[in-house]
């Protein structure tokens, strides 16, 4: 049963254009980069004795982490509850439920903070609970430092570009490749369609001193670039991939070797096609 976990990570590095390359994370078992942290956080919690048989895993998510955790919880026999804003992609909600996990939606106006607060409330209802707390869990950073960061460490890289999100991807790569310029990506709008890039909270694991620049991308521009990636590169990716590539192309005007990530698949956002 655990064999599928061996296929998480070591994703392909694909060329977008002359100066931009990207890790294709949709090839992970559940279809996104979040498989990496879900696996690592669960395994570390088990190792420390924080997560045991009979426990319920409760996490606030914009979708992808919930899907990844639901997959792993299904394999390991844990009950899973995913809490997410009501504007989360319906496809993602259905995918989480397909793994047998429960989903709870919080008001859009409360943004991601509302989902996090709901997990604390739910934690009081269950006697045996483990909260991954991806926004403050140092295992999130460590996972990308020894995983994604290590995978690209031997490549000549001038800059690494990724959505800020939980901060884990950026911080992990920053620690693995200290000489690389670290560029964060955020949505320009308060209410946007780029899931997983800007969640409306400041992650505790985010160290701003390690970020060299933040680039803001409009939702409509991210969607347009996502469609171009499909039509020009043959890569069916999600909206955050379009945002990351746009930001990487801005950075590539100054630097020759820029690496970014394509976090998930376009199948999760049928409404944009």
Descriptions of predicted regions:
Residues 1-273:
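PLP-dependent amino-acid enzyme catalytic core
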């Amino acid at each position: 049963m655990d064999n599928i976990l061996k296929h998480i990570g070591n994703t392909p590095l694909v060329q977008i254009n002359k100066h931009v390359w990207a890790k294709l994370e949709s090839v992970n078992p559940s279809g996104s980069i979040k498989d990496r942290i879900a696996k690592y956080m669960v395994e570390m919690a088990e190792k420390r004795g924080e997560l045991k048989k009979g426990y319920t895993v409760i996490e606030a998510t914009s979708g992808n982490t919930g899907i990844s955790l639901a997959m792993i919880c299904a394999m390991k026999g844990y009950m899973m509850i995913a809490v997410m804003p009501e504007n989360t992609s319906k496809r993602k909600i259905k995918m989480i439920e397909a793994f047998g996990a429960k989903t709870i939606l919080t008001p859009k106006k409360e943004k991601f903070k509302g989902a996090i607060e709901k997990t604390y409330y739910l934690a009081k209802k269950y006697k045996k609970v483990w909260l991954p707390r991806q926004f403050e869990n140092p295992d999130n950073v460590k996972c990308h430092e020894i995983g994604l960061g290590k995978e690209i460490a031997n490549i000549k890289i001038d800059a690494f570009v990724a959505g800020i999100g939980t901060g884990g991807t950026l911080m992990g790569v920053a620690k693995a490749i200290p000489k690389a310029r670290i560029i964060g990506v955020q949505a320009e709008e308060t209410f946007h369609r780029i899931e997983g890039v800007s969640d409306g909270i400041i992650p505790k694991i985010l160290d701003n001193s390690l970020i060299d620049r933040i680039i803001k991308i409009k939702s409509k521009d991210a969607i347009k670039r996502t469609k171009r990636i499909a039509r020009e590169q043959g890569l069916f990716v999600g909206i955050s991939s379009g945002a990351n590539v746009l930001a990487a192309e801005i950075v590539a005007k100054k630097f020759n070797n820029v690496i970014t990530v394509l976090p998930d698949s376009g199948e999760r956002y049928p409404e944009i096609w």
